[in-house]
C-alpha cells in the first residue's frame, strides 16, 4: 500500500510537471509568424479586384530633376536602419526622383510585430537640391538597398538593390552591379506592348545576430497580375537568392516571363563595334546559357541587332538558364571606369519540375550602354487560369565563377569571334571573298585529355538563309582545345541567319551546342 500511494503521488507530480512543461513550451512558441501565405492572401484579393494604378505624390521639382541632381540625394550612412541592432545586415533607402516617382511601402517584421518603416527627410543628404521639408515629410521611399560586410569585415557594401518596377540587383564578393533580375515579365516583345509589374510593398525580416541570410517578402501588382514573393538572400563569394513566388492572373496575358533576367550588350568579339573603340567588348553579359531538361547544354552569343529580335528554345523542365559574362580577363574589356570584367553572371536554377515551355531571349537595338537591351526568361506553354495560383520556386546565382555553370564532362565555348571571310591566295595574301567568318574556340577538361591527333569533327547546321562554304576544325595548342572555323554566305542580308555547331569524336559529343544568330543587315 505504501508503495502504491507513493507511486500514485509520483505520477501526479510527474503529470503536473509535464503539464507545466507543455504550457511553457507552448508559450515559448510565437502565436503568430509572418510568412509568404500572408502576402499571398493579399495578392489573391488584389487579383479579384480591378487594378488601381499607383498614384505619384512626388513634387514636380523632384520628378523633373536630371540624373546628376538625383545623384546628389544621398542616404546618410549614420542613419542606416539596424545600425543599433546586433546584425551584420543594414538597410538604406532610395529617395523618390525622376522616373522613380511612386512610393513603395516598406515594413520591418520581427517575431511579434510588423511595423512600417516611415519616410523621413532626415534619412537623406540633399546636397544642393533645394527642397521643402514640409512638402516631402510623408513622401515615402522609392526602394531600398541592403548592406553587408561582404568584402571586408569592417566595411559594409551594397549587396542588394530593389528599385523600380520589379527589378532587383544582387552582387557577391568582389563583384559590381551589372545585370538585373525581375519578379515577373508580361508580354515582353509583343506588338501589344510590355506590361511592367511592380513591387508595391515589402516586408523585411529583422535578422537575428548570427543570421547569415536575409528574408524579404514582396507584393507584386500590375493590370493583369498580382503576386507574392519570398526572397532569401545568402551573401558570399557567390551571392545566392532563393525565390518562392505565387502569382495570380487578373486577366489573360499573351506571354508570361518567369525568372526574367535583364542585361546589356553593346558590342563584343562576335559583333565588333561599328566605330573604332579601344574596348574589345562593352557588355554586362555576353551570352545566354541553357541547361535543358534532356541534358543538352546550349550557348547563344548575344547580339545588339538593328531590329528587335526574339529567339526561343523549347525546354521542358529546364535544369537552368542564365545570362553569363564568360571571359574574366581585364584585357577582354579594358575599361577602368566601368569594370565589365567584375560584373556577375546571373543563373536561374529551377526547383521542381516546371513542365513544358520555352526559354526566350529578347534582343533590343541600343545605341549606347545606358540601356538594358537583353531579356531572358522561361515562359510556360500553358498559362495558369485566371485566379488560380502559379507556384514557382527557383534559386538565383550571382557569380564570377562561370566554370561551375557548365558540365565538367563536356567542353564549352570560350570565345566567338566574327570577321570578314577571306581566302589565302597562292601569294599568301588573304583575299576577302564576301563571306562572313566565325571563329569558335571550345575548351574543357575532356578536350585537354585528348591527344591532338584525335579525329575531332564538327556537326554543323545552318538555316535556309545561309550556306556554309568552309567548315574546319583544328587543334588549338594555346588553349589545349579545338577551334572551329566557319565561313558562310548569306542569301538575304535583310534576314537573320541561324546556325548551330558542336564537336564530336565519333559517336561521342564533346561540347555544348553553339547556337548563333547573325543579325539582319550586318
Swiss-Prot record:
Pfam families linked: MdoG
Membrane spanning stretches: none
Assigned GO CC terms: outer membrane-bounded periplasmic space
Any GO molecular function: carbohydrate binding
Functional summary from the UniProt entry: Involved in the biosynthesis of osmoregulated periplasmic glucans (OPGs).
Family (UniProt): Belongs to the OpgD/OpgG family.
Name this polypeptide is given: Glucans biosynthesis protein G
Taxonomic lineage: Bacteria, Pseudomonadati, Pseudomonadota, Gammaproteobacteria, Enterobacterales
